[in-house]
Amino acid sequence: MARLKAPELRELDVEELERRLAETRRELFNLRFQHATGQLENTGQLREVRRNIARLLTVLNQKRQEK
């Protein structure tokens, strides 16, 4: 998954953010599994996905507090 940018995420609604968060968490699970079995070549993906999750959670919490 490409790097998610906060300004782009702020344009999305809460439901879409939650869907993307679930999808990204699934991706992190799969990457961790690949890493544990020695199949993951680019370990930097783990860091990128973790940071994407953090961005999603940040924007999601900001939107929830606006209400």
From Swiss-Prot:
Domain of life from the UniProt record: Bacteria
InterPro entries reported for this sequence: Ribosomal_protein_uL29, Ribosomal_uL29, Ribosomal_uL29_CS, Ribosomal_uL29_sf
GO cellular component: cytosolic large ribosomal subunit
PROSITE patterns xrefs: RIBOSOMAL_L29
Any one GO biological process: translation
Pfam family for this entry, one: Ribosomal_L29
Sample GO molecular function, one term: structural constituent of ribosome
Keyword annotations of the record: Ribonucleoprotein, Ribosomal protein
PANTHER family for the chain: 60S RIBOSOMAL PROTEIN L35/50S RIBOSOMAL PROTEIN L29, LARGE RIBOSOMAL SUBUNIT PROTEIN UL29C
Family: Belongs to the universal ribosomal protein uL29 family.
Protein name in the entry: Large ribosomal subunit protein uL29
Taxonomic source organism: Rubrobacter xylanophilus (strain DSM 9941 / JCM 11954 / NBRC 16129 / PRD-1)
Gene: rpmC
